[in-house]
Amino acid sequence: MARYLGPKLKMSRRENIDLFLKSGVRAIDSKCKIEQPPGQHGARKPRLSDYGLQLREKQKVRRIYGILERQFRNYYQEAARLKGNTGESLLQLLESRLDNVVYRMGFGATRAESRQLVSHKAIMVNNHIVNIASYQVAINDKISIRDKAKKQSRIRASLELAEQREKPTWLEVDIVKMEGIFKKIPERIHLSAHINEHMIVELYSK
């Protein structure tokens, strides 16, 4: 499945929740009727079966993290091999992606912008350039902005926006040095309450 390149707000309206695909400069409800499905008149949503609800939940999480279907399935299979709760492990793997950590640290206004920073070689891990968005960040890894990229206005603007968001407890960020430490794997209680990972596990367990 190809990556979706259409209107970002349309996806949030489809899922009836803010997927954090926009920068957050303006509240999403000031841009569109988030509770109203996409379409000229907001077509009524059909009542979904259990399978339909599980599928929608998977699509929602995929869109939040910007993951393609095959890659998402691979993450699930890896999570299933790990000890502990499969759903929680899945979210922890997604949260440990380099593009997501860059976003959480505030260097990118969105995950898509953070992915672009990584692919454009603006990000370093332990003082080495890493341009793979799916790179799995490990505990105590240092994530930093390359010196030549520190003057980018979008990075500075993103850091200002990040000050308005709740700061992740599993990260330590120095906005002056434009670097941060991945202190620990986030616990489920610290991640979005709007995600029902158990439905995804049920979907893939069939």
From Swiss-Prot:
InterPro entries: Ribosomal_uS4, Ribosomal_uS4_bac-type, Ribosomal_uS4_CS, Ribosomal_uS4_N, S4_RNA-bd, S4_RNA-bd_sf. GO terms for molecular function: rRNA binding; structural constituent of ribosome. The keyword Nucleotide-binding does not apply. Transmembrane segments: none annotated. SMART domains: Ribosomal_S4, S4. It comes from Baumannia cicadellinicola subsp. Homalodisca coagulata. Keywords: Ribonucleoprotein, Ribosomal protein, RNA-binding, rRNA-binding. The lineage of its organism: Bacteria, Pseudomonadati, Pseudomonadota, Gammaproteobacteria, Candidatus Palibaumannia. This is Small ribosomal subunit protein uS4. Belongs to the universal ribosomal protein uS4 family. Residues 96-168 form the S4 RNA-binding domain. SUPFAM superfamilies: Alpha-L RNA-binding motif. The gene is rpsD. Pfam families: Ribosomal_S4, S4. One of its GO terms (biological process) is translation. GO terms for cellular component: small ribosomal subunit. PROSITE patterns: RIBOSOMAL_S4 (PS00632), S4 (PS50889).
